[in-house]
Amino acid sequence: MRRNRAAPAGTVHSLSVDSGVLKSNRLGDPTTRDVPVYVPHDHDGAGLPLLVDLAGFTSGGPAHAGWKNFGENLPQRLDRLIAEGAMPPSVVAMPDCFTRLGGNQYINSDAMGRWEDFLIDEMVPEVERRFGCGGEGRRGLFGKSSGGYGSIVHAMRRPDCWAAAACLSGDMAFELCYLPAMPGVLRTLAKKDGSIETFITDFEAGPKWSGGDIHSLMTLAMAATYDPDPDPDAFCGIRLPVDMETCEIIEERWTNWLSRDPVVMADSHAGNLKRLRALWIECGKADQYNLLYGARRLQRKLAAAGVEHVYEEFDDNHSGLDYRLDRCLPFLAKALD
């Protein structure tokens, strides 16, 4: 979709949030975070719903507001959808939650940092104070992949804050999306004498990274998120849920991972989702990370629990899915308007 230059352009404001809760992160990541905030044309934001955009792994909110080839960035997409009357005017915050390990799952972790607390207790209040938007019953969040994971988990855990959520190809059914990557991670680490620290420091110093390196880093980030090593001397708080020599699952650690799996969490948190005004879940039928099967499992559990939601499957994989926002953004904004 090429940009519709006839659509009146909104304004992207630059906001900076100095976090107190992120100071405990073990990665050495910055605690002052940029938050581009989109306000529609001819509005100052007052009285509008607030949507929060959670970026996928290796990305961050500011990237969604930047120049884009062959298509629209997020503000331009919002301009078009609002101008066409497809969605009501809404304020959209695009926080920078990028980390040393390449991304974020947007939950609290002793290693990665208290990202759930940052978003809910620090960023949202600052955006609402500055623009007069959102408020109880008028906040939603959306994201794809890691951002989709963050959206559904926030909705499960904090319906007191969020009234609507969209999970696009979110991480779930961990035994299908994460365990298959473990042998490759071990092979990568074996080239560094099994040292996680050496791999990461070499990655940071290197002029170029392979796709395999990125995927290995992503798996290490998941380890720091779902099962941070309690040993304060562990580099970046990372330990894997498998034996480094045999790739056998270490049950105690893997159980910690599974406790953060949305499919597992649905057993105890589905009731919270009933408090939402709107819930959207979708996944591509050719998703290369096997996320379709997790989405189907989650959908069945929610249906059995009587949770109202929209569930869609579509003919595509995990990549280049920004066009799917044309479906879920109007859905969220209308529910919050």
Which stretches of residues belong to each language-model region?
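Non-catalytic cap/lid and distal C-terminal segments of serine-dependent acyl enzymes
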Residues: M1-D337
